Design a protein with these regions (language model features):
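Signature of Gram-negative outer-membrane beta-barrel scaffolds
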Residues: 1-77, 103
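Outer membrane beta-barrel strand-and-loop segments of large Gram-negative receptors
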Residues: 2-3, 7-10, 115, 119, ...
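Gram-negative outer-membrane beta-barrel proteins
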Residues: 9-11, 41-49, 60-62, 90-96, ...
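Residues that define the transmembrane beta-barrel architecture of outer-membrane proteins
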Residues: 13-17, 62-66, 122-126, 173-179
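Membrane-embedded beta-strands that build the outer-membrane beta-barrel scaffold
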Residues: 19-25, 31-39, 68-76, 80-88, ...
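Surface-exposed extracellular loop regions of Gram-negative outer-membrane beta-barrel proteins
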Residues: 43, 78-125, 144-166
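A short acidic, glycine-rich active-site loop
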Residues: 59, 112, 169
Length: 191
């Protein structure tokens, strides 16, 4: 006997269309800039039922977003440069985070429910890097990064009956920062 309930399934359509344009500006042998802009049209449709199986849930989100980027490089020598960059990006809710149904997650031994009120998160990304190119195909770079999130999506939990139930919410703001070291070394000398 099939015991599938209306609230156990949903249908969805996801459309993302994008266009990107950029321009390079070389002010001198030492200083160059790349400026870009990305436009995205996003349409998300979800049809299903709330967890009671009685209330239809229809989501139809249409958005147009603009994401600028700027990358400035200053060449100290032909093998050394400093780079500063900015870019804006987005983190859209995944289907499982936004659909109005409950599923059991065996990794955390708890039910997880979606949240139809989730907003997308916008991220402003800032980078500062020093790059060194000792030989062709080799790179050493050291960087600092800072990311500022608006409406980040977080998993939260609450007591539900005899256990815990997880869901997703938007926090107001979050930041992430750190350092990066990247080394690309040609190992052809090993044979």
């Amino acid at each position: 006997i099939d015991k599938t309930e209306k609230c156990d399934s949903y249908t969805s359509d996801n459309l993302l269309g994008a266009a990107y344009v950029s321009a390079d500006f070389n002010y001198s042998d030492k200083l160059n800039t790349n400026i870009g802009i990305r436009a995205e049209y996003y349409n998300l449709k979800i049809d299903g039922y709330s967890t009671d199986g009685l209330t239809p849930v229809n989501i139809d989100q249409k958005n147009m977003d603009i994401f600028p980027s700027v990358n400035i490089a200053y060449h100290l020598t032909d093998k050394n440069l400093f780079r500063v960059a900015y870019g804006r990006s987005v983190n859209r809710p995944e289907f499982r985070e936004i659909v109005p149904y409950v599923y059991y997650n065996f990794d955390v031994f708890a039910n997880i429910s979606g949240n139809i009120d989730l907003k997308k998160a916008y991220i402003n990304n800032y980078d500062l890097r020093y790059e060194f190119y000792p030989t062709a195909g080799e790179t050493v770079s050291f960087g600092l990064f800072y990311k500022d999130f608006k409406n980040p999506i977080e998993q939260t939990y609450h007591e539900a009956g005899s256990g815990v139930q997880y869901t997703y919410h938007n926090a107001d703001r979050a930041v992430c920062y750190g350092i990066e070291l990247d080394i690309k070394k040609n190992l052809s000398f090993l044979g």
